[in-house]
């Protein structure tokens, strides 16, 4: 089905208000969920909203909490999210990293005691729109087996890198071949995954999203490489924030909350002039996209460039929402 941005935001806002969230906070949170969905990231927008409300009702998310600065070391700051709303706090933390970068050339904010930030790409994009390189990542509860294991012991720990090119170039990727959100998107659409995304119950690689969702044997990106990246990203976030690791979140908490996140902004213009920056970025993009195609019907893509097109299509034609997901939200 199709809905408008206004319908989507109003539905989110209604549910938040009914759960006791104050009107200003509810409006800002609903706006971010709706913008994420409008951008085409359904897995971490509308599809994720019922799970967000479940955690709100369970007390994992404290809607009136505000992040608090703990330590300041010039270009580096350490903050405590105090289990506040994840997407609103993440936006504030990237804004703070940008402020630090304006003064120092680079800004790094390490956040502990945080909640799920929904679409991580929003915060990299936020920096790139202002002319900064944006880098951020988060740890999570253990939802992926390390390479060679059957049991979940590491997080998908998504990493975002956004570049202020025209259009913005951005990688937003979990350390698994697919996020659990994308497994859900493909399952709801009745599709197999385009490539292997995990193991079935017999230990064979599979493209069946429902099987992987059930047995939790999701495949690390690049096999042992994604497994290793997940571990070191968790270590860095834990150390810089003095926060909880994947092991602590999984073993000590009843659900995924109290996680650790990193936000980095770099002011490119302190290092290179604008025309030179733009020319160098354009040459990279032209060189990549001018390669001979393996399939004449399949364009060579640059990461993140599709979001401009998706946003325009959704604004023109309405936002696609799965019927079952919309029914869940209406019932909340």
Swiss-Prot record:
Classification via HAMAP family: Diketo_gul_reduc
Name this polypeptide is given: 2,3-diketo-L-gulonate reductase
Subcellular localization: Cytoplasm
Key word NAD present: yes
Pfam families in UniProt: Ldh_2
Subunit organization: Homodimer.
InterPro entries: Diketo_gul_Rdtase, Mal/L-sulf/L-lact_DH-like_ah, Mal/L-sulf/L-lact_DH-like_NADP, Mal/L-sulfo/L-lacto_DH-like_sf, Malate/L-lactate_DH-like
Alphabetical list of PANTHER family matching this protein: 2,3-DIKETO-L-GULONATE REDUCTASE, OXIDOREDUCTASE-RELATED
Other remarks on this protein: NAD is bound in an unusual conformation, at the interface of a dimer of the enzyme.
Gene field: dlgD
Known regulation of activity: The enzyme is inhibited by tartrate and D-malate.
GO CC aspect terms: cytoplasm
Enzyme class, broadest EC rank: oxidoreductase
Annotated catalysed reactions: 3-dehydro-L-gulonate + NAD(+) = 2,3-dioxo-L-gulonate + NADH + H(+); 3-dehydro-L-gulonate + NADP(+) = 2,3-dioxo-L-gulonate + NADPH + H(+)
Coiled-coil regions, chain positions: none
One GO MF term: oxidoreductase activity, acting on the CH-OH group of donors, NAD or NADP as acceptor
EC number annotated for this UniProt entry: 1.1.1.130
Keyword Oxidoreductase: yes
Ligand binding (NAD(+)): 168-174, 224-225, 304-306
Similarity remark: Belongs to the LDH2/MDH2 oxidoreductase family. DlgD subfamily.
């Amino acid at each position: 089905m199709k809905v408008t941005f206004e319908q989507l935001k109003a539905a989110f806002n209604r549910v938040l208000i009914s759960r006791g969230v104050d009107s200003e906070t509810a409006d800002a949170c609903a706006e971010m969920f709706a913008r994420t969905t409008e951008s085409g990231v359904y897995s971490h927008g509308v599809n994720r909203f019922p799970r967000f409300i479940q955690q709100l009702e369970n007390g994992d998310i404290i809607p009136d909490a505000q992040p608090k600065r703990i330590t300041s070391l010039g270009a580096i700051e350490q903050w405590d999210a105090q289990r506040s709303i994840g997407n609103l706090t993440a936006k504030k933390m990237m804004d703070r990293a940008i402020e630090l970068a304006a003064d120092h050339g680079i800004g790094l904010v390490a956040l502990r005691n945080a909640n799920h930030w929904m679409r991580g790409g929003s915060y990299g994009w936020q920096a790139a729109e202002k002319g900064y390189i944006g880098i951020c990542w988060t740890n999570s509860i253990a939802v992926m087996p390390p390479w060679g294991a059957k049991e979940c012991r590491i997080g998908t720990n998504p990493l975002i890198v956004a570049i202020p090119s025209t259009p913005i170039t951005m990688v937003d990727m979990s350390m698994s071949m697919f996020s659990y959100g994308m497994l859900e998107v493909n399952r709801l659409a009745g599709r197999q995954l385009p490539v292997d995304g995990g193991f079935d119950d017999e230990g064979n690689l599979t493209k069946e999203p429902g099987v992987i969702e059930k047995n939790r044997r999701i495949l690390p990106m690049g096999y042992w490489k994604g497994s290793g990246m997940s571990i070191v990203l968790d270590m860095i976030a834990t150390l810089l924030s003095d926060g909880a690791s994947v092991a602590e979140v999984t073993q000590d908490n009843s659900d995924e909350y109290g996680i650790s996140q990193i936000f980095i902004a770099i002011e490119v213009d302190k290092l290179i002039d604008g025309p030179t920056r733009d020319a160098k970025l354009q040459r990279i993009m032209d060189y990549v996209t001018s390669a001979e195609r393996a399939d004449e019907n399949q364009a060579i893509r640059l990461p993140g460039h599709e979001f401009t097109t998706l946003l325009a299509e959704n604004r023109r034609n309405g936002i696609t929402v799965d019927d079952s997901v919309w029914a869940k939200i209406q019932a909340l």
